[in-house]
Amino acid sequence: ICGDPLATSLSHPLAEAVTGQPGALVNPALVLHVSIGQSTVATRQVIANLFYRGVALHRPVRHGETLRSTVTIQGLRELSRREDRPARGLALLGIHTTCVNPNGSDGPTVADYERCAMLRFRDPEATTGHNDDLGAADPEVDLEAWHGLAPTWDAAPLRPPRPVDPPSGQRRTDPLRDTVTNAPELARLTQNLAGVHRDRALGPGGRRLVYGGHTIGLAQASLCRMLPDTGTVLGWQSCDHPAPVFEEDVLTFHHTVLDERPSGSGRLRAVRVEVDAERSDGSTDAVLDWRLVTWGA
């Protein structure tokens, strides 16, 4: 659905040459789609997901492995009431995803992160008094803090014939825009239970809301087109959704390499990806501001 050309997930021989292990790697975006989908057991009545932060991918996932996620409520905040909308509040969730061992027990950690969901009240007349400080994501990426997640793989097979070395701080726009399609299909495939992604009656203006990870998946696909020497994604420093995305929106992707550091035979990159959506009426909105860390050649 997202068309991600990440080479280590598309090619068995290349994945084996890079990792030194047999078998193909599951795309890290798909790993997080599944994890996020599992976490929606806590947010079926979501209005929107506002942000992700501190996303850390601790190990790669290979085909055939089973994932399990646990969700912890880390904070709740009731929002101010307005006559033109139902009662709502914010829930800060901590998600921990593991691989399942053959005996059914939790195995090694795959991912840890937080996400903030805006939810409808079960009882619109209720007053909860919740007013937790949910904090804010730090957008500044310190690559030194990410070295512990970097793999000890061989980056040489990822190096293209012509080096890919975009100058740090230069904003580059992907010439290939992309149209958002198959949104409910991705939600179903990843067991995302949020009704707003499946039922247009629950969305703003009677339109289905595109799952935020769908936009992120298309943004990662664009990143891998622009930086084809990318081997994997190690995590997301921050990820904000400033406006909703709808099916048939046409997305434009802007990429800025913020920093890079050597790591083993490869390098770490801190990248900012900004996405704009062109609507059916011709208007344009910023819909994603994403700061992530990659490892590659």
Predicted stretch roles:
Residues 1-52, 111, 121-234, 297:
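Hot-dog-fold acyl-thioester-processing enzymes
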Residues 35, 52, 67-73, 91-97, ...:
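Short, structured motif recognition centered on aromatic/hydrophobic residues
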Residues 56, 116-118, 174-179, 240, ...:
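Generic structural detector for well-ordered beta-strands
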